[in-house]
Amino acid sequence: MSLFTNKTLLITGGTGSFGNAVLNRFLATDIAEIRIFSRDEKKQDDMRHAFQLKMPEVADKIKFYIGDVRDLASVKNAMYGVDYIFHAAALKQVPSCEFFPIEAVKTNVLGTENVLTAAIDEGVKSVICLSTDKAAYPVNAMGTSKAMMEKVIVAKSRTVSPEKTKICCTRYGNVMCSRGSVIPLWIDQIKNGQPITITDPTMTRFIMSLDEAVALVLFAFEHGESGDILVQKAPACTLQTQAEAVCELFGGDKRNIKVIGIRHGEKMYETLLTNEECAGAMDMGNFYRVPCDKRGLNYDKYFKQGDTTRNTLTEFNSNNTELLNVEQVKAKLLSLQYIRDEMGKQ
């Protein structure tokens, strides 16, 4: 990882699943320092002790900063001397954001504005922001706040030279076994002899591992241009398929799956690339790149100039991507350390 040699990386919301995955990936490399910025001192203390036990020889590379992305002063305090930022801080629970939408705006929209403002002021070289498929065609408060976050990112990228600060965004689907995701809940339900609860068996969701989430961010870091939104071509599955896979791995009864109905703000399927974005998107193999629209507000010159280019890409959603079967989902789950650890406890 030569790009990170002797560099300082700041991760906002760094005590979450993504932050832990980044630490596992980078801590033993020649990176100089990784700063964890978050508002929960208990989670920071837990993370500190965990890495002191797991990787004692390099744990001193981790520096902890208590603060909130809503507070510009605390963000700036953590930003001094930082080379790169992975911005993962967010409110991401869909039902909670439905009841407290302004809180989602404060963290996901205004908090992102604070991070980018501080990054530009401090001369940070690269900022990669984490978004979600729920930002595409949003129907809920969380998705709407993330869609606005993406607009802030693109707008902010227009105000600064990419040679000074490059600002990119990644958009991805459900990360399996991440904090607050459904699979750990199902495992607990099986172990306690309770029914597995699913909202709708035909609902589809993109699925990816934490390692794949980190890989997407690194792809954006290395190949993205300022203002880009980068999307991974992730597979998907139905909730029924996912629940059956978990049952088979953990000895659950597939007849004991209980349908509880869709929760506040949920969609039947998710979209990673919209039809509108397809007009300017680029196919990059395992990824799509949605470049920033670099036109200004003076449209007259564009009308005169014209543009005859057409794109053959179509909307990419969890209904038209590759749908995995039970065996394929089981194989994907077995690749996760969390699943192997939980199976070892049986």
PLM regions with names:
Residues 30-43:
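Conserved glycine-rich Rossmann-like NAD(P)H-binding loop of the short-chain dehydrogenase/reductase
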Residues 38, 65-66, 106, 200, ...:
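Conserved residues in the N-terminal Rossmann fold of short-chain dehydrogenase/reductase
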Residues 63-84:
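Conserved Rossmann-fold cofactor-binding substructure of NAD(P)-dependent oxidoreductases
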Residues 64, 104, 127, 167-170:
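Hydrophobic/aromatic anchor residues within beta-strands of the central parallel beta-sheet
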